[in-house]
């Protein structure tokens, strides 16, 4: 005779049996023997089951001990003696009691058992929530996510503060990233004068294209001469690149009318993009045009334009198979140009997805493209040295993408121990990347960090080009360290984060104090304001949230000084970017909270001492800088 598919206890309780061995889940829960009876007539089986399992109930106290991690004491769940027990009407086994139990006592006893079960369920729920809180998934540290984290810290601080004068509402996403589209009415109807256009194009190749190589210099200038020779150009994609380059160069000059001029030039490029045939077929010229437009939108920190333009550029690059190895039949110069165009799309895609917390277009497992070859770097700029920045940036972006995929994705481990196993090898990759940086970049970094520059080096053109570029590389590296160690709660990882944040802000402070002219040549990606704001929040969190923060007045005042440096930087970027204006408001609220916390930790930290030690920096009026020659040229536009 065959056995039943469910054990006897599951059949009695009318529960689906898992048929596990040696005991199913139900029998394990009730700590009963798991027995499978042969198929028999239903009445006899039900009667025997009631007699056998009727008195089995959930062992509350033993189960609670199992939840707490202790071994439960063995319990006797054998069948009771039929002489001393009798079968009740509801199928349970009870002792033969001569006197029936009083009704009130029965209700109290049941209420007590109910309270015990509720307490047990609450204990289980509490332990489960604490376990999830300790091993929860880490959200991608986008700009909005970091500000929300800071907002939660402020709310927690305000709840324990007797005086509450600062509103806890810090972030308004709509005001931080408002939807912005170019205005068609501002577009140019005529081609700009050649002298003006040549000045702006040369500036772009000197300060942008040489270390973000998108165009071959000779090829672009050939098309430039054709435009002014014939008075028109038949390639709309090239015209989009042309007007976008003029707009980006104009806004980077930061003259009195540069913002209005840049908006008009970019609106002209936007008119050509809106033509119906632009997105129908992919081409190299269109990818280049979208890259420059993305750079302009990145300089203004326009989130909607950045995501749209960069996404279309990356999709076109994939359709053209730029992420694959090029055939040997392609000319080496052309293959190198296509390779660099792809890596430009890759860098933009990964940075924008990180800053705004959006999905990345490229899948790293699908990429089969070699790194740029430095022997071709002179094709893309008017001077050498660009690959000292571009090639390490590509390698660093690949590591950043690995960090995101392994620590911040849906499949990332939630246990802290598993995260540590991922963090250690990636940290070693980052240290190896830093050791393999070009010696010239390391030299500029050491001089910048220690605020020691020789007059000979400071007056050279190479210093002007490479110092800020090297600062951008190290700023990205320090932010990558923060992103890597941020998911871990260990003391060592927190120490790495706070040291990286302090070094990043110190770099910014020293650079802007040394030579204000280089500030004009700030990289568009860096002006996203994401890189400066990340160390700002790390230092703020260390001051306010952490309980083991150093409480000596010197350390607290130095950290407040660093926060004030970032605040001053946002103030100076306010005329360029609308996002900077919102970050100024956010930084001001956080800075006030940090001052209150530091004063509570150490009585020596007061407003007067803070004002004495904070040096800050105040940039000169940008309109008073020595750009008379360029100003006269732009006035003719």
Swiss-Prot record:
- Zinc finger map (C2H2-type): 304-327
Give the source's domain of life in one word.
Answer: Eukaryota
Where does the record say this protein resides? Answer: Nucleus
- Where is the DNA-binding region? 7-34
Tell me one GO biological process term.
Answer: positive regulation of transcription by RNA polymerase II
Q: Which InterPro entries match?
A: AtrR-like, Transcription_factor_dom_fun, Zn2-C6_fun-type_DNA-bd_sf, Zn2Cys6_DnaBD
> Which pairs of positions does the record mark as disulfide bonds?
none
Q: Give any GO molecular function from the UniProt entry.
A: zinc ion binding
**Keywords, comma-separated and alphabetical:** DNA-binding, Metal-binding, Nucleus, Transcription, Transcription regulation, Zinc, Zinc-finger
Q: Name one GO cellular component term.
A: nucleus
Is the keyword DNA-binding in the record?
Answer: yes
SMART domains in alphabetical order:
Fungal_trans, GAL4
**Any stretches that span the bilayer, and where are they?**
none
Name this polypeptide is given? Uncharacterized transcriptional regulatory protein C11D3.07c
Q: Which organism is it from?
A: Schizosaccharomyces pombe (strain 972 / ATCC 24843) (Fission yeast)
């Amino acid at each position: 005779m065959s056995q039943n598919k469910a054990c006897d206890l599951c059949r009695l309780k009318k529960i689906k049996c898992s048929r596990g061995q040696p005991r199913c889940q139900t029998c394990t829960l009730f700590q009963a023997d798991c027995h499978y009876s042969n198929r028999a007539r239903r009445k006899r089986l039900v009667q025997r089951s009631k007699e056998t399992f009727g008195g089995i109930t959930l062992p509350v106290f033993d189960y609670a001990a199992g939840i707490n991690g202790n071994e439960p004491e063995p319990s006797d769940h054998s069948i009771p003696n039929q002489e001393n027990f009798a079968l009740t009407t509801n199928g349970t086994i009870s002792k033969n009691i001569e006197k029936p139990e009083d009704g009130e006592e029965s209700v109290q006893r049941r209420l007590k058992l109910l309270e015990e079960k509720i307490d047990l369920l609450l204990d289980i729920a509490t332990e489960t929530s604490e376990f999830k809180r300790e091993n929860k998934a880490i959200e991608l540290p986008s700009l909005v996510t970091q500000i929300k984290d800071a907002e939660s810290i402020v709310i927690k601080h305000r709840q324990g503060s007797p005086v509450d004068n600062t509103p806890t509402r810090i972030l308004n996403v709509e005001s931080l990233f408002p939807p912005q589209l170019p205005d068609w009415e501002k577009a140019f109807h005529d081609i700009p004068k050649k002298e003006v256009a040549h000045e702006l194009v040369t500036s772009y190749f000197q300060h942008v294209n040489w270390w973000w190589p998108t165009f071959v210099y000779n090829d672009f200038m050939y098309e430039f001469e054709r435009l002014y020779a014939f008075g028109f150009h038949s390639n709309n994609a090239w015209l989009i690149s042309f007007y976008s380059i003029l707009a980006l160069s104009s806004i980077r000059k930061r003259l009195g009318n540069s913002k209005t001029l840049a908006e008009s030039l970019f609106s002209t490029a936007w008119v050509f993009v809106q033509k119906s045939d632009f997105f129908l077929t992919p081409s190299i010229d269109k990818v280049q045009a979208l890259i420059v437009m993305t750079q302009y939108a990145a300089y203004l920190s326009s989130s909607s334009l950045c995501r749209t333009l960069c996404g279309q550029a990356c999709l076109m690059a994939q359709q053209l198979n730029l992420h694959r190895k090029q055939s040997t039949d392609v000319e080496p110069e052309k293959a190198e140009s296509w390779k660099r165009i792809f890596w430009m799309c890759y860098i933009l895609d990964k940075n924008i997805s990180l800053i705004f917390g959006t999905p990345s277009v490229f899948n790293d497992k699908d990429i089969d493209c070699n790194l740029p070859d430095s022997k071709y770097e002179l094709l893309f700029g008017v001077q050498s040295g660009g690959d000292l920045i571009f090639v390490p940036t590509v390698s660093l972006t690949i590591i950043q993408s690995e960090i995101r995929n392994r620590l911040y994705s849906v499949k990332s481990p939630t246990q802290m121990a598993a995260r540590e196993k991922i963090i250690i090898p990636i940290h070693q990759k980052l240290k190896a990347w830093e050791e393999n940086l070009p010696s010239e970049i390391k030299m500029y970094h050491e001089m910048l960090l220690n605020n020691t520059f020789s007059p000979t080096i400071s007056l050279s053109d190479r210093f002007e080009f490479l110092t800020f570029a090297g600062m951008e590389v190290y700023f990205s590296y320090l932010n990558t360290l923060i992103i890597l160690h941020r998911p871990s709660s260990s003391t060592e990882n927190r120490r790495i984060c706070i040291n990286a944040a302090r070094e990043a802000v110190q770099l910014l402070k020293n650079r802007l104090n040394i030579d204000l002219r280089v500030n004009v040549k700030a990289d568009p990606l860096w002006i996203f304001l994401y890189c400066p704001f990340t160390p700002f929040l790390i230092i703020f969190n260390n001051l306010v949230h952490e309980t083991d923060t150093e409480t000596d007045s010197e350390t607290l005042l130095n950290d407040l000084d660093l926060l004030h440096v970032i605040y001053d930087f946002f103030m100076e970027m306010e005329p360029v970017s609308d996002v900077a204006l919102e970050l100024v408001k956010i930084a001001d609220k956080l800075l006030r909270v940090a001052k209150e916390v530091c004063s509570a930790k150490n009585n020596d930290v007061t407003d007067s001492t803070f004002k004495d030690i904070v040096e800050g920096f105040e940039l000169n009026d940008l309109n008073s800088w020595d750009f008379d020659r360029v100003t006269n040229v732009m006035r003719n536009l």
